[in-house]
Regions:
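Structure-specific nucleic-acid interaction/processing domains
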Residues: 1-89
C-alpha cells in the first residue's frame, strides 16, 4: 500500500508541519482545514497548526508532497515521518 509524507508550510513565517497520509495530499489538506475550523475533537482546537490556520488564514498555508513510498506496517509509516521531521528541523 502507498503512503505520502507531506509538509504544510505557513508562508508568513515559514514554519512547517510534517505529516503522513494514505489519501491524496489534497484530501488530507482539506481534512486539516476542516479540523481547524469545525472539529468535534477537543484536542484539535489546541493543535498549533490549527491555531495558526485560524489566526493567519488558510490562504497562508501550502501543502507539498515530500515522498511517496510503499509501506507494510504502521511502524514503517511512522518511522518515515519521523525521519522527515528530523531532516527538515
Amino acid at each position: 500500500m502507498n503512503a505520502t509524507i507531506y509538509k504544510i508550510t505557513n508562508t508568513k513565517n515559514n514554519k512547517i508541519y510534517v505529516g503522513q497520509t494514505k489519501q491524496t495530499i489534497e484530501k488530507r489538506f482539506k481534512d486539516h482545514i476542516r479540523h481547524a475550523f469545525n472539529s468535534e475533537r477537543p484536542n484539535d482546537l489546541n493543535c498549533k497548526l490549527y491555531i495558526a490556520m485560524r489566526e493567519e488564514g488558510i490562504n497562508h498555508f501550502v501543502i507539498e508532497e515530500l515522498e511517496v513510498f510503499e509501506y507494510t506496517t504502521r511502524y514503517a509509516l511512522d518511522k518515515k515521518e519521523i525521519e522527515w521531521i528530523a531532516k527538515l528541523n
